[in-house]
Amino acid sequence: RNHSSAASDVYKRQLVRFRKKISTEKRKQYMDQTYWGKPVTGFGDINGKIMIVGLAPAAHGGTRTGRVFTGDKSSDFLYKCLHNVKIANQSNSDHVNDGLKIKNTFITPALKCVPPGDKPLNEELKNCFGYFKSEFEILKNLKIIVALGKIAFDTCVKFYRENFNYTERVKFGHGTYFKLPNNVLLMGCYHPSPRNVNTGRINEKQMTKLFKKVKELV
């Protein structure tokens, strides 16, 4: 076994340990709930033309509920905007049986497990590329990827560099988009995190406008 393979196993074990820690210690208000506590994959319409890529499942959101962007403040904000443009049938995403449906869209985290401090390491992201790739391959009608935040954006670029020999220099910007090798567009979007919302970096009007643009592009 080579050094990189052994190192990769170390990072995997670290993530699994942290995921289990979150799921057993829980947050006070969710003490009576059983946390999903496993990797969180994508959700939505596999025939869709839009793919929304987040960073990773939230510690007490996706890691608790088992569905990406579900049960936390970021998901409340995101779905309010997706409902505004009729991508989502409702403006909330609370738990897996809440009746949520999304149209023409697939949502997935770049990293399938919650990382410590919400800061994934490059090695952790690389470990998830295989799963990410299999989701890409399922989405036969994909036309546009919306990357929520710079890390998700850079991960998509890295993925295309490794799998499609993509060499263009691109830079993350809210609403800025680029053409990728297989005729898919990649658009940057500020992450709907409470920090970004509370500091005014992103608001409902801006994000709704961005998703209106996304719908026009497809």
Label each region the model flagged.
Residues R1, A110-V218:
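Glycine/proline-rich loop-helix segments at beta-alpha junctions forming the active-site rim
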Residues N2-A7:
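Single conserved hydrophobic/aromatic residue that forms the stacking wall/gate
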Residues V10:
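Active-site loops and adjacent core secondary-structure elements that bind or stabilize anionic groups
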Residues K20, L55, A147-I151:
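Short, well-ordered beta-to-alpha junction loops that form the rim of enzyme active sites
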Residues S23, G62-T65, N141, I202:
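Residues lining hydrophobic/aromatic ligand-binding pockets adjacent to catalytic sites
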Residues Y30-T34, K38-V96:
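Adenosine ribonucleotide-centric catalytic and binding domains
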Residues I52, S91, I107, I144-G149:
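A structural signal for short, well-ordered beta-strand segments and their strand-loop junctions
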Residues F77-E123:
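Short, surface-exposed acidic-centric catalytic microdomains
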